[in-house]
Amino acid sequence: MESHNVSNSLNLDMEMDQEKAFDYSKRAQWLRAAVLGANDGLVSTASLMMGVGAVKQDVKVMILSGFAGLVAGACSMAIGEFVSVYSQYDIEVAQMKRENGGQVEKEKLPSPMQAAAASALAFSLGAIVPLMAAAFVKDYHVRIGAIVAAVTLALVMFGWLGAVLGKAPVFKSSARVLIGGWLAMAVTFGLTKLIGTHSL
């Protein structure tokens, strides 16, 4: 009985040590790309739709502009992330070869494809939110309110998800994402509204 308890205690200690030893920084690359992509998808697509709506309040025009922003943004995010992470990959490979006598530990290297896919997928998921919020609302002002409300909820959700996956403080992460999204949306909407008003 005593040996059984000792064995269970050892197993629990080993599990705790493994959890502590787990390097959460390994998640950082794709997590950073995913959070960045989601925020960009939410904010840029919503701002684009609201900006276009300031000039032409037709729901079809707003949806088409948002869809175009989704496709272009997802491609841009994926390509940019792939190039960026691949540059980092090459640098780390060269450094490993110098330090390890030509040996490369691939499991420690960032994945360009993973980062690019996460970025594009997250952007698309984020961009769908304002599209769906605006799709079934006929009144322009109600439509804008629905977009802002949906984007706000989505920003909080993505901030919470990023904090949970990265083992970071939930409140700080969610607040940072939400405030940043609001600021970006306000600036982009204000500028596009100004341009549309003055017909520049």
Curated annotation (Swiss-Prot):
Induction: Down-regulated under iron deficiency. Induced by iron supply. It holds the Pfam family VIT1. Disulfide bonds: none annotated. The gene is VTL1. Expressed in the vascular bundles of the shoot and the stele of the root. Expressed in inflorescences and at lower levels in leaves. Keywords: Ion transport, Iron, Iron transport, Membrane, Transmembrane, Transmembrane helix, Transport, Vacuole. PANTHER family: FE(2+)/MN(2+) TRANSPORTER PCL1 (PTHR31851). Residues 56-62, 138-143, 198-200 are vacuolar. GO terms for molecular function: iron ion transmembrane transporter activity; manganese ion transmembrane transporter activity. It is a multi-pass membrane protein. It catalyses: Fe(2+)(in) = Fe(2+)(out). The keyword Iron applies. Can mediate sequestration of iron ions into vacuoles when expressed in the yeast ccc1 mutant. One of its GO terms (biological process) is response to iron ion. The chain crosses the membrane at residues 35-55, 63-83, 117-137, 144-164, 177-197. This is Vacuolar iron transporter homolog 1. The lineage of its organism: Eukaryota, Viridiplantae, Streptophyta, Embryophyta, Tracheophyta. Residues 1-34, 84-116, 165-176 are cytoplasmic. It is found in: Vacuole membrane. Vacuolar iron transporter involved in the transfer of iron ions from the cytosol to the vacuole for intracellular iron storage. Involved in regulation of cellular iron homeostasis. Vacuolar iron storage is required for seed embryo and seedling development. One of its GO terms (cellular component) is vacuolar membrane. Belongs to the CCC1 family. The keyword Phosphoprotein does not apply.
